[in-house]
Amino acid sequence: MLYSPKKLFLFFLSCIVLYVNSNNSGFVTAANSIGLNYGLLGDNLPSPSNVINLYKSIGISRIRIFDPNTEVLNALRGHRDIEVTVGVKDQDLAALAASEEAVKGWFAANIESYLADVNITFITVGNEVIPGPIGPQVLPVMQSLTNLVKSRNLPISISTVVAMSNLEQSYPPSAGMFTSQAREQLVPVLKLLSQTSTPILVNIYPYFAYASDPANIRLDYASFNTKSIVVQDGSLGYSNMFDAIFDAFVWAMEKEGVKNLPMVVSETGWPSAGNGNFTTPAIASTYNRNFVKHIASGKGTPKRPNKSMNGFLFATFNENQKPAGTEQNFGLYNPSDMKPIYKLF
């Protein structure tokens, strides 16, 4: 998550499959396809083996890690019922973009030894680096990795993770369009993905929109807590901001000739502290619970009705080595005792 105030202002001015059941207490019970992000930027995190046991105990079958961490991947050995998305570090992109041999070396060093007993289903090339100075490095690395896994007939999808800063305009959703830099860097990636219908991974955070303009954005609209139509866009009505942001990205892709490309929600969530009354456990719980119920309904979005979405909630733990404030408080669990900050599962 990298959101500058300027980008947020411009973006919002212009404007998993998760299957769940609610038990009698109102808590959410995860079924087999919900995903969680597993970040490691903390000095008080539990051991990876304990984290994997936590995932198993709450029915988590998909996780996303931001780099090929050996401790985590070793802890996942034998747990092939958990699908793993592994990220390529941003700082590795320059060397990997230089040659296909470098990519083969990276794969051999970081992925090869885990293929037999870890269920690696996605490799993501860079995290929110498009648009940006190293954005052009994403496409050649994706091409090399795609060629590699295809040549070996490996069931691993290659993609990248992008933020909504790629949108120059997002309101109303049908006006969604990419920035000029995104058109230069992202559209070739989207066209590569469309050749095999491989999803693009997107980070969607209604929280940042609400926090940047609470006077004009309703909390219930941002947190999935109203069924009333808040934004009418032609024949399409929006009762939550998540759908509006998602569909703005869909519209932007279509304007570049990329249609029907799947999208995976690589991150979404709401911080439970760090920004006063905007970030409480109650609001965070409301957003995440309502998000899961919304996705589980199978309704899709107004632009893509009745189409399921895969996704990952952000994040498993509060991470005390991230920037102070909200960034440290997106976790569902306290790392020191692994107790929930609020009950979700």
UniProtKB/Swiss-Prot annotation:
<keyword id="KW-0732">Signal</keyword>
<dbReference type="InterPro" id="IPR000490">
    <property type="entry name" value="Glyco_hydro_17"/>
</dbReference>
<protein>
    <recommendedName>
        <fullName>Probable glucan endo-1,3-beta-glucosidase BG4</fullName>
        <ecNumber>3.2.1.39</ecNumber>
    </recommendedName>
</protein>
<dbReference type="GO" id="GO:0006952">
    <property type="term" value="P:defense response"/>
</dbReference>
<feature type="glycosylation site" description="N-linked (GlcNAc...) asparagine">
    <location>
        <position position="119"/>
    </location>
</feature>
<feature type="active site" description="Nucleophile">
    <location>
        <position position="267"/>
    </location>
</feature>
<feature type="glycosylation site" description="N-linked (GlcNAc...) asparagine">
    <location>
        <position position="277"/>
    </location>
</feature>
<dbReference type="GO" id="GO:0005975">
    <property type="term" value="P:carbohydrate metabolic process"/>
</dbReference>
<comment type="similarity">
    <text>Belongs to the glycosyl hydrolase 17 family.</text>
</comment>
<dbReference type="GO" id="GO:0005576">
    <property type="term" value="C:extracellular region"/>
</dbReference>
<keyword id="KW-0326">Glycosidase</keyword>
<keyword id="KW-0325">Glycoprotein</keyword>
<feature type="signal peptide">
    <location>
        <begin position="1"/>
        <end position="22"/>
    </location>
</feature>
<comment type="function">
    <text>May play a role in plant defense against pathogens.</text>
</comment>
<feature type="glycosylation site" description="N-linked (GlcNAc...) asparagine">
    <location>
        <position position="23"/>
    </location>
</feature>
<keyword id="KW-0378">Hydrolase</keyword>
<dbReference type="InterPro" id="IPR017853">
    <property type="entry name" value="Glycoside_hydrolase_SF"/>
</dbReference>
<keyword id="KW-0611">Plant defense</keyword>
<feature type="glycosylation site" description="N-linked (GlcNAc...) asparagine">
    <location>
        <position position="306"/>
    </location>
</feature>
<dbReference type="InterPro" id="IPR044965">
    <property type="entry name" value="Glyco_hydro_17_plant"/>
</dbReference>
<dbReference type="GO" id="GO:0042973">
    <property type="term" value="F:glucan endo-1,3-beta-D-glucosidase activity"/>
</dbReference>
<keyword id="KW-0964">Secreted</keyword>
<feature type="active site" description="Proton donor">
    <location>
        <position position="128"/>
    </location>
</feature>
<dbReference type="Pfam" id="PF00332">
    <property type="entry name" value="Glyco_hydro_17"/>
</dbReference>
